[in-house]
Amino acid sequence: MSRIGKQPVPVPAGVDVTISGQNVSVKGPKGTLTLDVAEPIEVSRNDDGAIVVTRPNDERRNRSLHGLSRTLIANLVTGVTEGYTTKMEIFGVGYRVVAKGSNLEFALGYSHPVLINAPEGVTFAVETPTKFSISGIDKQAVGQIAANIRRLRKSDPYKGKGIRYEGEQIRRKVGKTGK
């Protein structure tokens, strides 16, 4: 049995979980999230009120979906209680970010500024012109928008200029040596 999948998902106080067939809806202090669980996987509540994920048999696909479904449900519970935040940094001369309403405007050395719109449920916060954070209750949405922003100007291995996650280490390369 999946080591992750067999663990029940604890439901903290103040969180309401509704299970109807393959649909799991989690409502908490920060909002509501829903998830459609893949077909062979079954979701139920145990006597303690925790969420239990089970699979019908040990086929390879079912084993894979078992742990995945349990983790996605745990992410929903964490999202509606604590939320998710990703911090990012910008390195490079003249590179900066400015908040324009709920959107971000980047100056990244291109001939034009790059505008990123905040998707529903995601908020941006600019601490300094080179540091900003992305917050939301949906882990997948926060991670995807962070990856899209990072892709605007990936960090250069020679000079280290670009956008990166806070604390991310960039492998540096040695440049050409002159004669």
Curated annotation (Swiss-Prot):
GO molecular function, one term: structural constituent of ribosome
Keywords: Ribonucleoprotein, Ribosomal protein, RNA-binding, rRNA-binding
Pfam families: Ribosomal_L6
GO cellular component: cytosolic large ribosomal subunit
GO BP term, example: cytoplasmic translation
The keyword Ribonucleoprotein appears for this protein: yes
Disulfide bridge map: none
Function: This protein binds to the 23S rRNA, and is important in its secondary structure. It is located near the subunit interface in the base of the L7/L12 stalk, and near the tRNA binding site of the peptidyltransferase center.
NCBIfam families on file: L6_bact
Subunit composition and interactions: Part of the 50S ribosomal subunit.
Family: Belongs to the universal ribosomal protein uL6 family.
Record-given protein name: Large ribosomal subunit protein uL6
Organism: Mycolicibacterium gilvum (strain PYR-GCK)
Encoding gene per record: rplF
